[in-house]
Amino acid sequence: MTDTFQDEAQIRSILDDGAKALYTKDADAMVAHYADDIVVANLAPPLRNKASEGRNKGVLEQWFDTWSGPINLELRDVHIEISGNLAFAYGVSRMSGTKRNGERPDIWTRVTHCFRKERGEWKIAHLHDSVPFYMDGSYRAATDLKP
C-alpha cells in the first residue's frame, strides 16, 4: 500500500470516528482528531470560531443535550485530495435524529474538512459546514434539498 492509500485510509477513518462520536454524543471523541489551532465554521453562529472555541467540549455537550437520542450522520460522495502534509475532504452529509422538544431534523449540508499531518498523524485543521440559500429574494436556507 502506498503512502497516499494509507493516508486516505487514515483520513476516512477519522471521518468515520467523527460520525461515531456524534452518534454517541461523545465530546472527547469529537475533538480527538482536531488540531490545536482548528478553525470551525459550522452551521451555528458565529461565522467562524477561534481555535480555542473549536475545541470547546462544553459547547458540544450543551448541544448534545438538546437531542433525546443518538445523532445520525451520513457522509456521502466524499472526495479526498492529498498533497504532502495537507489534505482536504469534501462531500455532503445528512444529520438526523430527535430533539428533546420532539423535532426530528433531517438535513443535508455541504461539508469540507481540511487536514494537516502533525508528527505523523492527520489532524483536522479546518472544518466547514454550509447549506445553500434560495436566491429568489427570500434568502431562506435550503435545508429541504436532498442529493
Regions found by a protein language model. Give the residues of each.
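Basic/polar N-terminal segments that are highly enriched at the extreme N-terminus
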Residues: 1-9, 145-147
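A solvent-exposed, acidic/Ser-Thr-rich amphipathic alpha-helical stretch
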Residues: 5-8, 13, 27-83, 92, ...
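Generic short beta-strand segments
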Residues: 91-98
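Short beta-strand edge/turn micro-motifs at domain boundaries
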Residues: 108-138
